């Protein structure tokens, strides 16, 4: 019965979101004028080629990939709390739920800060905090019952993860991707960026099965740390690229 309520809750929220988008977001599709339908300059294939030639789009794809690896890794926190910190399943789920409630706060806060200090800089900062959080879990010895340490680090990691989810598509505007190519760019970025859906859970399962207990989880956090480091480097590189492009325009 509880699962039934959850499913209906997701369905209702999704439908309401669709209705909101339909009425709240203006229709920017080319409309008919003078009896003729206007279409964007160039064919779809030309848009694809043009988008593929924009370095910032590829960097954004890598950033999304690294951020989404972290998001999929969030699913491992509760099992880590049980296997490494000796918590029971109920308490572990409660701690992870606290981290999950940071989603709206972190995403909204990061978006506001991104508008003020630029998105790429906030992404780099988020990856930095995420890297520190992952490295802590990867290389420190878990202490059974140390709930405060566990919760504190989960909150740091969760804040970084959900902050990035409120930022990465805003890079399109910061990178000055032409509006007419936005859909194509989002498609390319998504194809690359959401591939962690395919492999992260598999990697986690292999590592934890090969090394049961805390060791397997620590290996998985090394895996997560690697992607956090890549995301940090690419974010900093993109920030420098955009700064250089902006300076060249003045």
List the model feature ranges, each with a label.
Residues 1-25:
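Helix-loop-helix hairpin linking two adjacent transmembrane segments in secondary transporters
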Residues 27-60:
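Juxtamembrane intracellular "pre-TM" segments in multi-pass secondary transporters
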Residues 3, 87-96, 150, 182, ...:
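Juxtamembrane helix-start elements in MFS-like secondary transporters
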Residues 118-171:
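C-terminal transmembrane helical hairpin of 12-TM major facilitator-type secondary transporters
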Residues 19-24, 220-250:
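Multi-pass alpha-helical transporter architecture, strongest
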Residues 106-119, 208-209:
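Helix-to-loop junctions at the C-terminal end of transmembrane segments
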Residues 176-212:
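A late C-terminal transmembrane helix in Major Facilitator Superfamily
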Residues 54-107, 165, 200-201:
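Extracytoplasmic gate region of multi-pass secondary transporters
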